[in-house]
Amino acid sequence: MIHDVVREGRLSGVRSGEVAAFLSSRNADHWIAEADVLVDIAHLLMLYRQGIIEPEPAAAVMDVLLRFSADGVPEEAFDEQFEDIHAGIESLLIAEVGIEQGGRLHIGRSRNDEVATCLRLRLCEELLVIGDAVNGLCEVLVSLAGEHTHSVMPGFTHLQHAQPTTLAHHLLSYAQAFSRDLERLLSTYQRVNRSPLGAAAFASTGYPIDREFTATMLGFSGVLENSMDAVSTRDFALEALADCAILMVNASRCCEELILWSSSLVRFVQLDDAYCSTSSIMPQKKNPDTLEIMRARAGSVIGASTAALSIVKALPMSYNRDLQQLTPHLWEGIGDAGASIRILAGALSTATFNTERMETEAGRGFSTATELADMMVRECGLPFRTAHHIVGRAVRSGSLTLVSLKKAATGESIDLTALGLTEEKVQAALDPVHGIEARSVLGGPAVASVSTAIETLQESVKAGRTAIAEERYRRTTAITTLIKEARRLKTFHQ
């Protein structure tokens, strides 16, 4: 039976199954198993290159690591007797090649810098995956907006009819929010993409290691210099989770509106059957369950972020085992966010919008009253607050006509007819399309403004796609080079 080689020496006896399970991080370690092997390979290459380890043991250990990389880490490495995947892999390796050769892999490092490196390596990949999903969601929203620049709908504040807008304008509000989410994710990526490898337990090492070499071979853009900070910080995970929490808050708002819009009371959108469920008792039901689950997942991601912050709060320097408890929250939050965004993009791209009903609702609830007040300012020279009062009184009377406006203006001792107000001008202002086109400022709902916004966001989507693709290529190239050099070492000394 293979034993945990890390535990041997200082400690004696065998832990109970409950204690072993309590300490083990095996479930979360599945996320970083592949990264751990790559970190081992890079570290071993560096030890050989620096003359710290001889060719024969280097080649023997590399042979096993390359097999783990190609075939996957054996399931035995995740056994609960091992505190973590790092101990599991090292124990399996020593069992295969012997401690004289396999026992040299851990020279010049600790599990502290090893796990921090693995977390960063895998998180970099996940941030690019989520970034790609967010960019794809933006692309869906921008594409839909392009189809609906003339689709008039009511805009709401406090869930009440407020002002007319267009479906394109509404969709672009989400596209812009998600584009900021992408900016945050890519900015966080730059800080995650630093290597702590070589920091060892916290005080670095007396061996002549080359931290820049391992950083480059693993695709990192640089080294996290201070060795104590390198192993003890988890701010990179906190930042990633915070980004995901904000992202999911934005997604939950979109989900909430789609749920409301798909209701029998509103009927603005019909979701594709693939994103709905039915009732076990009510045969007519088509429920937006996927979006409801996504709305709930937003709470889970917020919870993961809060839990991670609470775990790190007030921890003394440097490494503390508390940090192990943060990792499951990281992967849970990352996984929920990525899946949610991909599913939301699918739900939107397959949805059918009821633009006729939207247009019917656009003029209800006196939603054109703001444009009417604005027109009275422009045409009659009234102060806006005065026009606001007049229109508000007319709304209270139950109608918006020249007659109701003139009656409402008597309290202000104003003769609207003398100021040039006509029924034709009133009716024009009450037309939702007229009010929309009047709002042609940057970011407004007018067709020209929306078209400009679409072009801007299309360029943003294109830039995001390019940035992610370039970074993926850079990382893939680095790992390809790493494996190539590892194979060269193995074959050269066999």
UniProtKB/Swiss-Prot annotation:
Catalyzed reaction equations: 2-(N(omega)-L-arginino)succinate = fumarate + L-arginine
Transmembrane intervals: none
Keywords, ordered alphabetically: Amino-acid biosynthesis, Arginine biosynthesis, Cytoplasm, Lyase
Subcellular location: Cytoplasm
The protein's Enzyme Commission number: 4.3.2.1
Name used for this protein in its record: Argininosuccinate lyase
Organism listed in the record: Methanosphaerula palustris (strain ATCC BAA-1556 / DSM 19958 / E1-9c)
Pfam families: ASL_C2, Lyase_1
UniProt pathway annotation: Amino-acid biosynthesis; L-arginine biosynthesis; L-arginine from L-ornithine and carbamoyl phosphate: step 3/3
Family: Belongs to the lyase 1 family. Argininosuccinate lyase subfamily.
Any one GO biological process: L-arginine biosynthetic process
InterPro entries per record: Arg_succ_lyase_C (IPR029419), Argininosuccinate_lyase (IPR009049), Fumarase/histidase_N (IPR024083), Fumarate_lyase_fam (IPR000362), Fumarate_lyase_N (IPR022761), L-Aspartase-like (IPR008948)
A Gene Ontology cellular-component term: cytosol
Record GO terms (molecular function): argininosuccinate lyase activity
Catalytic class of the enzyme: lyase
